[in-house]
Amino acid sequence: MTKTLVIYVHPVEESFTSCVRDAVIDFLTTQHHEVRLRDLYAENFDPFLSAAERALHHTPPTTRPELARDVEDLRWCEAIVFVYPTWWSGLPAMLKGWIDRTWMNEVAWVLPAGANTIRPRLTNIRRLIAVTTHGSSKFVNALQGEPGKRTISRSIRVMCNKFCRARWIALYGIDNSTLEQREKHLATIGQRVARALR
């Protein structure tokens, strides 16, 4: 079974996104995957990248001991499932801040001496799955270019195993969705995550 890190991002526990999180966790545990859940809001993760921390950009991760758990999780997992709402066409600031702070030098990538391109370090990660919601329609999101999807499927993926696959599981138009549509979406999440993990 797959070592799976679930990164959950939503400030309101009663949100539909929390139902999505529960559906993902239920599926993964039922299928006997090893799961670590990180609830960034509940943990009060600080997404703020300070000037002092940015000055440490090319130093080892040990210079930021407050991120040791994040580093260990990233090095442990074989798959990451991001569960979050899409806001303003992209990743919530909390998630973007987590990426900015934890996908760091000597963790996600390294720039060897004399080289002009970075090399990926998270080669243990073979699957990236985003499970998200959009307030607007799929058509509107296509017009906007889906920057959140691009961040995960392009920018993040290249720091992983060269055979890493990224999958996008989205419910579009949630602002005008019916209870039936939301329940149908929740009922299919397990199957869709299963396909993505193959």
Where are these regions (language model features)?
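Glycine-rich, highly charged phosphate/nucleotide-binding loops
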Residues: 55-75, 185-192
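Conserved alpha-helical elements of sugar-nucleotide-dependent glycosyltransferases
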Residues: 16-23, 94, 147-151
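Helix-loop-strand module that forms the ligand-binding subsite of alpha/beta enzymes
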Residues: 62-144, 148
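A short beta-strand-loop structural module common to alpha/beta enzyme folds
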Residues: 33-44, 167-172
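N-terminal beta1-alpha1 ligand-phosphate binding loop
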Residues: 2-33
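N-terminal beta-loop-helix "entrance" segment that forms/cooperates
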Residues: 40-61, 178-181
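Glycine-rich phosphate/pyrophosphate-binding loop and the adjoining helix
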Residues: 140-143, 147-198
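Short hydrophobic segments within beta-strands
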Residues: 7-9, 38, 83, 131
